[in-house]
Amino acid sequence: MDALRGSELILHAGDVGSAEVLRDLRRLAPVVAVRGNVDTESWAKTLRTAEVVEADSESVFYILHRIADLDLKPKAAGFAAVIYGHSHQPAIDWRDGVLFLNPGSAGPRRFSLPVTLAKVEIVDGELRPEIIHLL
């Protein structure tokens, strides 16, 4: 959790795992989370499958769990970034001027994947993404 201290907003792309995780994150900053395929218990019913977040006056983010479920053209829809999860494979990619970001997984190690999260700093309207390795 130390890596998230000082965050203005926390976005979670699903596979939260428990209501306690959300509670702990909300102690650090406001949280917007979507439901992942492992979020099947009653606490997760309030989570939507996708969210739109205005990160600042110029940057609107689209958050979903599975990138395969993306059913819109992000640039045409006015999104600066698409935040997604599911694979737990951290990735930063730019497509047609839109940031595609998978923060990976900050929870228990999955398979042989690294334990990571991502931060996006917005400076003068420019998105500056970074993958942070926790282990």
For the regions a language model picked out, list residue spans one by one.
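Active-site environment of divalent metal-dependent phosphoester hydrolases
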Residues: G17-V21, V38-A44, A68-K73, I83-W94, ...
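Short, structured coil segments at secondary-structure junctions
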Residues: R27-A29, G78, D96
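Conserved beta-strand segments of alpha/beta enzyme cores
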Residues: P30-V32, L99, R128
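Glycine/small-residue-rich loop that forms an oxyanion/phosphate-binding "nest" at active or ligand-binding sites
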Residues: V32, V38, L47-I63, I67-V82
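Binuclear metal-dependent phosphoesterase catalytic core
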Residues: V52-D56, A77, W94, L101-L135
